[in-house]
Structures are given as C-alpha cells and as structure tokens.
Amino acid sequence: MKRLFIALLPLLLTFAAHAQRPTDIWYFGQQAGLTFAEGNTPKPLNNSKMSTYEGCAVATTAKGELLFYTNGETVWNRQHQPMPNGHKLMGMGISTQSALIVPDPGSGNIFYIFTVAPQGTPNGLRYSIVDMTRADGLGDLPRVNLLLIQPVAEKLAAVRHANGRDTWVVAHRWNSNAFVSYLVTADGVAAKPLMSNVGSMNTGPGRNAIGALKFSPDGRRLAAALWRETNKFELYDFDRSTGKVSNARGFGPYPEAYGVEFSPDGTKLYGSCNGVGGGTTQIWQFDLKTKAAALVGKSANRKIGAMQLGPDGRIYVAREDNPNLGVIEQPNLLGKECKYVDEGLKLGGRRSKLGLPAFVVDPKYGVRSKKKNVMSSAAETSRLW
C-alpha cells in the first residue's frame, strides 16, 4: 500500500494543483466577459461594468470564483460595484497592460494591483493594496498608488518564483533597455528591483511605449512586442530564481507589433501586428526550434491587439470594437495547422477592444485538454535555443 501511495503521489499532487482555476473568468473591452468554468467552450458573461480600451486584470479564488477586476483606474468588486477607495488608480485603460493582480503569498485576503501609465508618462509603475476582509468581505483598498519606478513602458508581466511561493513582477524602464524585476513575498513588495540591461531601447515618441510583455507557460522565457518605430518582437531568457532577463533575440520588422503569446507547450511564439496606421492585421508564428516565421492569420478587422492563452489551450485574439474574438485553435501545431479563426468566439453582444486580461503565469497550472477535461502541465516544456 505504501508503495502504491508513493507511486500515485505525483499524480495526486498534479491533480491538486490543477483543481485550482485562477484564470477561469475574464473581463475586458466594452463590458465584455467570458467564463471557462463550464467545460472546454468559454461562455460569454454580460455582467461586467468595466470599459477599457486595452489593459485589464481579474482576481478570483483558487477555485475560480470572482473576487474583483480592474482596468488600472477603477476596481469593481464581485457584485460589480466600485470598491469605496477603488476609483483613482494611476494606471489607465489606454495602456497596453495597465493592470496586473498578484496575490500576497502570505495571506489569502491581500492582493496587489500593479499599474503602468500610458506612453512613458510620469505616473510610472505603481501598486495598490486590496484587503478582502474590508467592506463586509467585498474588499477595499487601504493604500493606493505606491510608486515603484518612473517612467516605464506599457509592459507588465508576472511569473511565479522558482520556490513556488513568491512572484516576480516585471516591467520595462522608459528611455532605457532595462527590465525591472520586483519580488513579491509574504513581507510585501520589494522596494528595489533587480535590473537587467538587455535587448532594445524603449525610447522615442511616447507611442513607442506601446506593446505587450508575456512569459512562457514554464516561466523560462519572456517575449515583448515593440511598437513604432522599433517594429519587432523580442525573445529573452528568464531566471525564475534570480529575476534576471538575458539573451535577447529579435524578429522583425513587423510594423505596429502589439500582442505576444506562447503556445501551451512553449515551442511557438505568436505575435500580432497591424501595419503602419492599422489596416494590415497579421498574426505571425515563430517556431522556437528552427527560428522560422510563418504568417498564420489575417483579420478582417482594422486592428487586432492582445493575445491571451486560455485555460482551454486556445489562444484568444482581441479585435478592436468587434463582437467576436479571434481564436488560434491548435497553437502547438506548426504553421497554418494551428488554425486561426478570425470570428472564432462570439461575445454575447458585447465588444472587444484591444486588450485581454493579464494573469500571473504559474508553471504548476496547465491547460485543460480539449478532448478530455484533464490538465497538462507546462513544467516539462523543453528548453529551446
């Protein structure tokens, strides 16, 4: 019996981890929403009170029950009402990744909302604290807009530390080639970041600050979209133990590069771009084994934006002012076999803008199989390049 238990222990731990569903609820765009809680096909939600052109974030319980959501300016509770002190956060919904929510590793009731201002403006990178024990369990913000660093680009991403407990929050300085990695522990948010000078300068006109930042599912790589006038995607290595970003590689030119996302198995990188001024919307796939680039999709929409991996293993693509999301159905597959569907998911009468919600990447969480309601982990993704 003891041998059987030892043999089954890894499987039991895997299922315990995957019973947690922190990315099942999405709110974004023009009061649009989705739930992934009822199987492999997401269903529209029409109860959102949030309008945001770009950035947004959602907090849930580990079981996927809504706690609150934000566009980086206002925070709404689970009853879709603004929190009492949740009106004046200093991110903006017109920033690519205006908000990101990180749970406090030492508490089930405290959350940090990180915000970045648009186009390298002085508001910079800040964080606000949400305490879910306040307002009769609906939550409120005892402290808001605590400055970390300024100015920054519109890039913001987070990944679980290698210890499986803490979290790295990564942004990019403006007028610099420096990534800044802040560690969030049970003691709070680190006052000083680890800086990594690597890759392209983020500088020039304020619009050059536009573009997303994403971690791979295993947390070992980081990708960025660099908008005008750089017009490219960059890939980096990331050390989850130290927070260091290194080894920059570029793909380009891709005019008005905006969104980035990795395939569930980490072997492909996807990027969205719109052409100068919009109107030439394209989705590119980069094979990280061969470095080959393939045009895998075009959109009838004038502009496309964020790309977000869903818990169902599909990648969803924001289409500006549109009642449908684009969907990459099989993102692990090479070239057009990945099957991009431009009007892939109806939003129940609501409209997408350019953003989709940001989440902390945790390698212990996987994606649900489309054929069976089981999970596959990113932990075994092989290192490439």
Outline where the language-model segments fall:
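Beta-propeller fold recognition
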Residues: 20-379, 383
